[in-house]
Design a protein with these regions (language model features):
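Solvent-exposed, non-transmembrane regions of integral membrane proteins
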Residues: 12-677
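Short, Lys/Arg-enriched N-terminal segments with co-localized hydrophobic residues
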Residues: 2-15
């Protein structure tokens, strides 16, 4: 009796919490608009009272969204089935982790997470940007507030997660079984930290375009930490999603050029270009217009990805169920934000640019070519993603653009960019001697040629694309160590002097080297896993042996299994690899709440590759005969290891930049935006 009354009390509290969350979300719409109005008018009039109001309102906006999000999360935790969103996406028997992740495992909740992260970034700008010119800061917060208002309105008018149903349901439908995985619990927050983070350089770019007297190179110094932070989270989010698809979907691959995968990959490419262009803008006071344009494009691609996922125009394992009203709203918002920004850029960009003050042979030129290649790669992915939609809209005909297109157009652009990433640090700023730079890279070139020749001989002239890919990774690895050796003057001074130089190097230099080393590891993983992958698909009986890549695999049969909220069958494989003997299990599950089947792969991961087994359906006549797919994916784990190392390098650089850059120093802000001081 006591337990029942306690449960009823929790439900009553949850219902009150939902009303509080709904009220907070409604109030936040007005506060967001207020932030935008006071920030813009206050900065234009240089009215300190209005500027202060925009500061305080930004904090209130963040607090209200936190309250709304926590209210919805509480409803999921206590299983308040009077809330429609909880009914559709949760179940009382789900583990606590999946009840919590169910908050953002649906369209409405994930949008609320988007706004939460957006307002969190605004709050961080307010806290960490207290040394920025007040006029600029209020303008940036106003733009952030305007973006937040647009998304809050989208939630309230088309995607409200706080709607109730009466009478309350006895239980819920449960989260999509495919999403009931620890990887997917953390994937959306990481991805959104990157996605939404691109709003910060966008807001700074628009604020710069609205300034009365232009800006100088300090603008790039302001945005670089935010771009780097977003890039790191986007790298982690994309790689975690790829890893999840690899082990959860049972198809043995790690990237399928799915439209929704591309929707997150395009902002990553644009932010990578932005990261490099901001270096030139900061160091050489050049490419300022290009940097601002990339800031606009990177965030616009994030909005485009949101439209593609939530409008219903795409069919994908990642896409949310949606309706036309949502698509129209997001499309209109995308057109207003992107179109308005590009018009403003066209009107104001000329006043921001300076003359080109570097020669064709210089580090600036190399970074510019790098930017062009990344931008072209972004355009090719964008074209391949949107082309089926364009053809369907114009000719009412369905087509698909698959991996062959993307591989054919993406590789010729990415390979030169990777080669340049090793070569450009050898060039000097403004003007450089090409022969000196080539001499510095001589040993890297020799090692690369030796590696390519050795593999070509060992492979007897076969697998040439894979051999060239290994050579590319070798070139990049050698380039990282060569660049580091140049920085510490290794071989030019005594050893202890080189160690002293290494000790005094800024963390951003270490971070760059680590990130580029991560790219090399990624290249090795992609090359080897793609070129030397082995696959077997066949029907087998219990006791039958399969030989694959030095593995001796015995299929021992199928047993019935039961989980906390699913029933299934488990295929058992006895594997012998040299002196090692182990078991791998693959399962076919049916989740009780939704009656939806899923496949769980059995994976044995080693540093040199994965053995990957998947159990299929049985033969309709001979029930013991089973379809199995077995893959050997060499070095596939290096793909995610490389991505993690890249993000780690970014965070190492970020830890340095937040302390040494003028973003937190009033000294570096002097003579900036002088007309507005």
């Amino acid at each position: 009796m006591h337990l029942k009354s306690q449960e009823n009390g929790n439900i009553r509290k949850a219902k009150m919490s939902i009303e509080l969350g709904h009220f907070s979300l409604c109030l936040s719409l007005g506060i967001g608009i207020f932030v935008g109005i006071t920030g813009i008018i206050g900065s234009w009039r240089q009215d300190s009272r209005l500027i202060s109001l925009s500061y305080g309102s930004t904090f209130i906006l963040f607090f209200l969204i936190v309250l709304a999000f926590m209210s919805l999360m509480n409803a999921y935790i206590v299983s308040d089935f009077s809330v429609t969103n909880v009914i559709l996406n949760s179940h009382s028997e789900k583990p606590l982790l999946y009840r919590i992740s169910g908050v953002w495992g649906n369209h409405e909740g994930s949008l609320l997470l988007w706004v939460l992260i957006l307002t969190f970034y605004s709050f961080c700008i307010l806290v960490f940007g207290n040394k920025l010119p007040s006029v600029l800061l209020s303008r940036v917060l106003a733009i952030q507030g305007g973006i937040a208002s647009g998304f809050i309105g989208f939630i309230l008018f088309t995607s409200n997660p706080f709607l109730r149903t009466f009478p309350p349901a006895i239980n819920g439908n449960g989260l999509n079984p495919v999403l009931q995985d620890p990887g997917l619990a953390f994937h959306p927050p990481l991805l959104y930290m990157g996605y939404v983070g691109m709003s910060v350089p966008f807001s700074f770019a628009i604020a710069a375009l609205l300034s009365r007297n232009g800006i100088n190179s300090i603008f790039a110094r302001w945005i670089r930490p935010w771009v780097l932070c977003s890039w790191c989270f986007l790298t982690l989010g994309i790689s975690l999603g790829s890893w999840w698809a690899y082990y959860e979907l049972g198809w043995g691959g790690w990237w399928f050029w799915d439209p929704v995968e591309n929707a997150s990959f395009m902002p990553w490419l644009a932010s990578t270009a932005l990261l490099h262009s901001s270096i030139v803008a900061e160091k050489r006071d050049s490419l300022k217009s290009w940097t601002i344009l990339l800031s606009i494009i990177a965030f616009s691609l994030s909005l485009l990805g949101t439209f593609l996922v939530r409008s219903g125009v795409l069919t994908s394992v990642h896409a949310f169920a949606s309706d036309p009203a949502r698509g129209i709203y997001i499309l209109a918002f995308f057109v207003v934000v992107t179109g308005g920004s590009l018009i403003l850029f066209a009107c104001r960009a000329v006043s921001l640019e300076t003359k080109v003050n570097f020669s064709p042979i210089s580090r600036e030129s190399a970074l510019l070519v790098n930017n062009v290649l990344f931008s072209a790669a972004t355009c090719t992915v964008l074209l391949g993603t949107l082309w089926p939609l364009i053809i369907d809209a114009i000719f009412d005909r369905s087509i698909s653009v698959g991996p062959p297109y993307f591989i054919a157009v993406f590789l010729p652009l990415s390979i030169p960019a990777i080669i340049l990433s090793s070569f450009s640090p050898m060039l000097s700023w403004k003007r450089s001697d090409l022969l000196i730079a080539l001499k510095k890279m001589m040993y890297s070139g020799i090692v690369t040629v030796i590696v390519i020749a050795s593999f070509y001989w060992y492979m007897e002239g076969t697998h040439l694309p894979g051999i060239l890919g290994i050579g590319l990774g070798t070139w990049l690895t050698c380039g990282v160590f060569t660049e580091f050796a140049e920085r510490i003057k290794l071989g030019k001074f005594k050893v202890y002097e080189s160690f002293r130089r290494a000790k005094n190097l800024p963390r951003r230099n270490y971070g760059m080297s680590v990130a580029h080393l991560g790219v090399a590891v990624l290249v090795f993983g992609i090359t080897v896993s793609s070129e030397w992958k082995i696959e077997i698909e066949k029907m087998v009986l219990p006791g039958e042996e399969i030989f694959l890549a030095n593995y001796n695999i015995v299929f021992e049969g199928v047993e019935k299994v039961k989980g906390p909220n699913w029933n299934g069958e488990r295929g058992i494989f006895n594997v012998k690899y040299g002196d090692e003997n182990f078991y791998l299990n693959s399962e076919k599950r049916v989740y009780m709440a939704s009656n939806m089947p899923t496949t769980e792969a059995g994976i044995n991961s080693k540093i040199l590759g994965d053995l990957y087994v998947v159990i299929g359906e049985n033969d309709p006549i001979n029930k013991e005969l089973r379809a199995v797919r077995i893959y050997h994916n060499p070095l596939v784990g290096w793909i995610w290891l490389g991505a993690f190392i890249m993000a780690l390098g970014g965070f190492i650089s970020l830890s340095d930049r937040f302390f040494i850059l003028g973003f937190f120093s009033s000294k570096s802000n002097k003579n900036v935006l002088a007309a507005e001081s």
